[in-house]
């Protein structure tokens, strides 16, 4: 991995842990730590764009309270599955 890609991953991890709400910190932070490095380039670009979205929208999308925009749907599904598996193991 080159220096630019490493810097981008570090920046996205930091932004995942330092959101506007603690709830999204606890959802996106662990996801970024566990899964960000293995995402393909196109999904990384989508994740970077996702980080610019409002936390109130993100939490509704992750919790399934409203449908995410189509461009974010695959990422939101992965994030929700990761959070569910981490926070509600065995369910």
Cite the ranges covered by each PLM segment.
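Positively charged, polar, low-complexity stretches
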Residues: 2-91
